[in-house]
Amino acid sequence: MKIYIPKRNPASHKGSYGKCLIIAGAEGMAGAAYFAALSAYRTGTGLVKLCSAKENLGILQTLIPEAIILSAPKIKENFQELEKAIEWADFLLFGPGMGTGKETEDLLRLVLKKGRAP
């Protein structure tokens, strides 16, 4: 895989290599969020913002301290922090370990409505 990832310019910084928002990991599914973030870093992403269930935050901060960690909002809670993260991102990933329930579907609809990133 190394041959597919270009060498980095020594004068660059992590912000030069893209900002990824990952919305992943329902309660008890921290591993899915962790592996999604790890994959983003390993494929060259410079900055990762990881939004997961609040029960996962301590685990994720320990496993992948270089990521910016956010608590996933419930639909009826304040959505503003996630909206800011969506605007911040160059690209986003939604879904690993999120489940298939109505709350996940509603959150996905909001993300798709607000998102502009691929």
Located regions from the model:
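Small-residue (G/A/S/T)-rich helix-start motifs and N-terminal tracts that mark the onset
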Residues: 1-118
